[in-house]
Amino acid sequence: MTQISLELIPRTRSGLRAELAAVREHFPSVGTVNIPDLTRFSTRSWEACAFGRPHFRTIPHVRAIDLNPGEALPMAEPMAAHGIEDVLIITGDAPSDMTRRVYNVDAEQAIRRFARELPHVRVYAGLDPYRQSFAQERDYLERKLDAGAVGFFTQPFFDLRLMEAYADLIPEGAEVWWGLTNVTTEGSVNYWASRNRAVYPRSFEPTLEWNRRLAGDALHFARERGQHIYFQPIRTDVVEYLGGIL
């Protein structure tokens, strides 16, 4: 059965609580919340996920480059205390000003460490359709599965045809969470194209209507395949974006 997650940004704790309450009120089909670990905010992802328990299954993002190999995993105890049993591990980008200490740890190494030290935790990895060739990304996915990942959260897609291509490449048996987001300003269009090298179809329009139509089509795509989906509302009211779709 298809599960649905919302990716929420922990800008403030009060704001996050309000968003979680809105999701509970308007979207009873949403059973999961995933939260990125953004170093510009004071609340770490696993701390933010605690606010969603026990009403939601919560999945904190963990940046591999933040994990000090010589110290205990800082999220292990908070996760256990709040019954958080899933993580999404990405390598992470180094801070531009280098004021924050990072380590020479990649996603594969971090996945192996979680599998070794927290074997009860389900580990997801990232799938990025824009960073390298199809064959290179497929091989990278297989290495992360070998390291101990159970499945993948994808970067947001903007084209169902590209989703179909990757659906055929993902190793059989891996759990998949397809990613969608809303891009409704020229700034967002340029950000995704330049920073993440996203590919837009010719039919793309930076309107809420176009993004809502894609969200509905992608949800149907995931349900047809028995896979999962998450939505990443960016500076948009989640009810306006997904109301009537979920």
Where do the protein language model's features map onto the residues?
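Active-site pocket-lining/capping segments in soluble small-molecule metabolic enzymes
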Residues: L6-A18, F27, L88-P95, R100-Y130, ...
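Glycine-rich, proline-tolerant flexible connector loops at the mouths of alpha/beta enzymes
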Residues: F27-A48, I89-V102, A149-M163, F231-T236
